[in-house]
């Protein structure tokens, strides 16, 4: 039995690939200058002490107004929190060619990430100071393909149920024309959290 050698993958791009009309069509939106709401936002993570000292709605509002940094994943994934009310959160996102899957659409994981973020933050917005939470279940339904040409999308989430130990929320992802792209639901466990 041979030993697997981890050799670097060599990708050869032919002239045919470089001038494929489908490739050019997919990459064309990259040249547009659409921007998210706040391109100068701070990125980072606050200490657990700060996180647990504030109720969820106040903490998330701090991310909106710059008092707290936005989570690093949101920068990596080109998504941004833009609205917070207790039990309701809105994100926007920019699906670009860097998130393409092999068949030329935006990978479903990108849509799942923006939905997960919005649905989880929706639950976070209901937390009391000293409470923590974690996602224990998530379900996503994909309705239409997301493409780089889709442009900036909007993800709206709302709280469905908030108990003392679990909460459920749902989210919907729309294109700029209001067409539904994907929707999902999420269950989070709520627990007393410690600062250490």
Regions inferred by a protein language model and the residue ranges of each:
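Terminal targeting signals and extreme-terminal segments of soluble enzymes
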Residues: 2-196
């Amino acid at each position: 039995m041979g030993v697997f050698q981890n050799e670097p993958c060599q990708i050869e791009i032919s002239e045919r690939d470089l001038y494929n009309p489908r490739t050019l069509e997919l990459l064309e939106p990259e040249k547009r200058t659409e921007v998210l709401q706040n391109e100068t936002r701070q990125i980072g993570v606050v200490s657990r002490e700060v996180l647990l000292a504030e109720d969820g709605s106040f903490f998330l509002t701090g991310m909106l107004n710059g008092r707290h940094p936005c989570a690093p994943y949101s920068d990596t994934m080109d998504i941004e929190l833009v609205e917070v009310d207790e039990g309701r959160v809105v994100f926007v996102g920019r699906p670009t060619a860097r998130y393409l899957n092999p068949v030329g659409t935006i990978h479903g994981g990108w849509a799942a990430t923006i939905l997960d973020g919005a649905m989880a933050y929706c639950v976070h917005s209901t937390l009391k100071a000293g409470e923590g939470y974690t996602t224990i279940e998530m379900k996503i339904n994909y309705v239409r393909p997301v493409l780089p040409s889709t442009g900036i999308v909007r993800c709206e989430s709302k709280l469905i149920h908030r108990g003392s130990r679990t909460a459920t929320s749902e989210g919907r992802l729309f294109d700029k024309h209001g067409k539904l792209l994907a929707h999902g639901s999420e269950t989070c466990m709520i627990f007393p959290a410690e600062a250490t």
